[in-house]
C-alpha cells in the first residue's frame, strides 16, 4: 500500500515541471482541516508555513479543555494563516451512547471557551450526521447513522444558524446507501426552510453525479466541500477495505485531471463548490500534503478563471465572511 501511494505522489512531483504553466496561482483557502493530539502545535505550524495554502480554517481534535489554547498557539506560530472553526465533536457528539443534551452542551461550552479567549471564530467544524464504523489502531469507532431530523443534529444546526455561520454537515450517502434517498430529501427541505443560510456537505457527502445535479437543481444554498474526493482516497479504499468508509467518490481521472462531467458541473455552477483538504490525522499533514496542494492547483487551472477563483477562495470568503483578498494570480 505504501509503495502504491509512493508511486502516486512521485508521479505528481514529476509532473510539476511539465505543468508549470498550467497550475493555478491564485489565493487558495483550505476551508476545513483538523489538528489532533498526534501532532504538536509547532510541527503543524511549520508544515502550514512552508506550504502553498494562503489560509486554513482549522478545527481542533483531542482534549476539549485545551482546544482554544492549541488554536491560539497555532495561529501565533503561523502568523495568522489560520481561522478557527469551533469543534462540534469533542465531547462525544458522534458517539451513540452519548446523550444529546451532553453532546450539545459540549458545543456550547467550546463556544464560550472561544469567546472567553477572544478568538474571532469564523464558523463551526463539521457536524457528524452519519459516519461509517472505523476499525483502525488509532481509532475504534462503532459508527453512527442519524438523519437531519435527529434531536442532536437539529439542535447543533440551530446553534450554528443562530450564530449566522455556514453549517458543515458530514453525511455519507454511499456508506449508508439505504438511507440516501431520505437524506437527499431532507437536505432539500433544509435548504428551502433556511433560504438565506448556507449548508456545506463535507467530502461532497459521497454524492453521485446525478445526485449532485439534483441538489444543485433543487436548492440554491446546499454546497459541496471537495475534501477526500480524489485518487489518493480511492487507492486507500481499494487496498484496505473494511477499515473505515468505503463510499468515497472521485472527482478525478487516473491522470489527476477532473473528470469531464465534474469539470463541466463546476464551470457551470462555481458557487456550489468549496475547496478543502481536510487533514484529519497526523499522516495527512506529514505525508503527501504538498502533493495534494499541487494536485488541486493543477486541477483548478483546468477550470475557467472565474470558477477556479470562486472554488479556491471566493466561496469560502463569502460563506465564512473572511477578510481576505481573492487574487486570481498572486504574482
Could you tell me what each predicted segment is?
Residues 23, 69-175:
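Active-site gating/metal-coordination segments in enzymes
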Residues 2, 20-29, 35, 39-55, ...:
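Mid-to-C-terminal alpha-helical segments outside catalytic/metal-binding sites
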Residues 27-31, 54-60, 83-88, 122-126, ...:
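Structural recognition of the beta-strand scaffold that forms the well-ordered cores
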Amino acid at each position: 500500500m505504501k509503495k502504491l501511494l509512493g508511486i502516486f505522489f512521485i508521479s505528481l512531483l514529476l509532473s510539476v515541471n511539465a505543468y508549470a504553466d498550467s497550475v493555478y496561482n491564485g489565493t487558495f483557502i483550505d476551508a476545513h482541516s483538523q489538528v489532533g493530539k498526534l501532532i504538536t502545535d509547532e510541527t503543524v505550524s511549520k508544515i502550514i508555513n512552508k506550504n502553498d495554502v494562503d489560509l486554513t480554517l482549522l478545527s481542533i481534535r483531542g482534549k476539549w479543555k485545551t482546544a482554544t489554547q492549541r488554536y491560539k498557539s497555532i495561529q501565533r506560530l503561523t502568523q495568522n494563516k489560520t481561522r478557527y472553526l469551533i469543534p462540534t465533536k469533542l465531547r462525544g457528539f458522534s458517539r451513540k451512547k452519548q446523550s444529546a443534551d451532553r453532546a450539545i452542551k459540549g458545543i456550547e461550552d467550546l463556544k464560550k471557551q472561544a469567546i472567553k479567549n477572544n478568538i474571532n471564530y469564523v464558523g463551526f467544524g463539521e457536524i457528524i450526521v452519519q459516519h461509517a464504523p472505523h476499525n483502525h489502531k488509532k481509532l475504534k469507532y462503532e459508527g453512527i447513522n442519524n438523519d437531519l431530523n435527529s434531536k442532536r443534529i437539529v439542535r447543533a444546526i440551530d446553534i450554528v444558524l443562530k450564530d449566522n455561520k455556514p453549517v458543515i454537515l458530514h453525511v455519507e450517502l454511499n456508506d449508508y446507501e439505504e438511507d440516501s434517498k431520505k437524506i437527499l430529501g431532507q437536505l432539500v427541505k433544509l435548504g428551502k426552510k433556511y433560504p438565506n443560510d448556507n449548508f456545506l456537505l463535507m467530502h461532497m457527502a459521497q454524492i453521485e453525479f446525478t445526485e449532485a445535479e439534483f441538489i444543485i437543481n433543487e436548492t440554491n444554498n446546499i454546497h459541496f466541500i471537495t475534501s477526500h474526493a480524489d485518487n489518493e482516497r480511492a487507492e486507500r479504499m481499494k487496498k484496505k477495505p473494511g477499515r473505515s468508509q468505503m463510499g468515497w467518490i472521485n472527482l478525478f481521472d487516473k491522470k489527476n485531471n477532473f473528470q469531464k462531467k465534474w469539470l463541466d458541473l463546476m464551470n457551470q455552477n462555481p458557487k456550489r463548490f468549496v475547496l478543502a483538504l481536510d487533514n484529519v490525522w497526523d499522516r495527512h499533514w506529514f505525508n503527501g500534503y504538498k502533493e495534494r496542494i499541487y494536485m488541486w492547483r493543477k486541477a483548478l487551472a483546468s477550470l475557467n478563471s472565474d470558477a477556479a477563483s470562486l472554488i479556491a477562495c471566493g466561496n469560502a470568503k463569502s460563506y465564512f465572511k473572511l477578510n481576505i483578498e481573492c487574487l486570481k494570480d498572486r504574482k
